[in-house]
Amino acid sequence: YMRNLFVLVLLAITLGCNCAPLKRGSQDDFRAMRDSMVNTFQQGMLQHDTSLVMQSWRMSENLLQVDKTHKENIYHHRAVVMAWLGRKKEAIENRWLEIQCMTDSNPDKLVYMAKKYTIENKKDSAHYYISKLLEFCDSNKDKHYNDQKSHEGYMAYLKLIAISLNEGPAKGKEFLDKQLKKDPGNDLYKYLKDNWKDFLKYLNDKT
């Protein structure tokens, strides 16, 4: 399911922590704490050890008190922890807190809000964020990056989400098929085609 991919993406960009509470400290201290937080969760996840996962959760609580510059990443981590534990309500709550820390132009925020309002059948609000997401794709598609192929694939992925939400899954599938014809070796496109039902579940999941 796409949540597996979601968890991997979250882990890749989440920064980690140490359990001892601090009233003040350097950025190096906070970085070490964040690293410890993530490492503890990964260890608990791999060993299926709930006590380690909850230890990572407690680390995140300490970090929220002292590290004021990485709240987005910390809430991100907390959402992953709750999702892994199967506590969906708390996962959604922490995901929402993470979203509120993002800038309005952040594509993750645009995707989340577009999905949220589509699920809630708030058509005007959904259309607004879908339009913003499409604008983001159009304004960034011609920018040049070191890994141009990955950038183009990411822009196509965001556009696939927007089209699927706005025009329906059938139109989204047509768009994906066109992208595959252009780039048949693209691993992301092939994954999405092979796991299309999971992608549709992802579109209807607020986490």
Q: Where is each model-derived feature located?
A:
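Helix-turn-helix repeat elements of alpha-solenoid scaffolds
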Residues: 45-59, 83-94, 123-136, 168
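Terminal, low-structured helical/coil segments at or just beyond the last alpha-helical repeat
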Residues: 158, 165-207
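Flexible helix-coil transition and linker loops at the boundaries of alpha-helical arrays
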Residues: 22-26, 60-73, 99-104, 136-150
